[in-house]
A protein has these predicted regions:
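Extended, low-hydrophobicity, polar/charged segments
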Residues: 3-197
């Protein structure tokens, strides 16, 4: 009986603190260095953001509850590479859009795109799978990762992402991303239009 109970408990949705906080956590205890680096980066740019804390979110479905709480859609982040594993791409796209390689390959001029592995994600972005975020680019000092953004993400009023760890989600104005964050990161980026079907 206990085993069955454990099973159902493990199947439960991640616990989400329903409080919407403003800015960085007051208490940094237990927060990772890379997460704190994200708050420092945002604060240095004078960016206002909302924050929700939660257990690790591993699926887009789990993210939906956070989206609902923040009243915004958090985009899907994909870490891709070419076949030779010499070019790496961080793609930000709407969560509900299906990812179809051929449309992206055509627009960015790279054939045979595939998902890069977790080791490379850690090496270049200091992030482990499940926590992928635009904010990882603060660790890509050598600008090895190409940033690719679906136009729809930039057209949204708000932009949501993890602070390099999937136990918090941040929400900020997309205009701040375009006018302050992207210039501060210094990564050139390409805007693409991916099909909804």
């Amino acid at each position: 009986e206990m085993k069955d109970q454990e099973k159902t408990e493990n199947m439960e949705e991640p616990r989400i603190d329903k409080t919407i906080y403003t800015g960085r956590p007051e208490n940094m205890e237990g927060r990772l260095e890379k997460e704190i680096a994200v708050y420092d980066f945002l604060d240095s740019l004078g960016i206002e953001y909302k924050r929700v804390d939660h257990e690790a979110l591993m699926t887009m479905e789990a993210c939906e509850e956070v989206d609902h709480l923040l009243e915004a859609k958090i985009c899907k982040n994909l870490f891709l590479c070419n076949r030779q594993k010499t070019d790496f791409y961080l793609l930000l796209m709407p969560g509900e859009k299906p990812f179809k390689t051929k449309f992206l390959s055509k627009q960015i001029g790279t054939a045979r795109l595939s998902f890069a592995d977790g080791e490379q994600m850690e090496e270049y972005l200091n992030i482990t799978p499940g926590s992928l975020s635009l904010m990882g680019l603060i660790f890509d000092k050598e600008k090895k990762v190409h940033l690719v953004i679906d136009k729809e993400v930039l057209d949204e009023e708000y932009f949501g992402c993890h602070p390099c760890i999937n136990t918090s989600t941040l929400l900020m104005k997309t205009s701040d991303v375009k006018e302050k964050i992207l210039p501060a990161l210094g990564h050139e980026y390409q805007v693409v239009e991916l099909p909804t079907e």
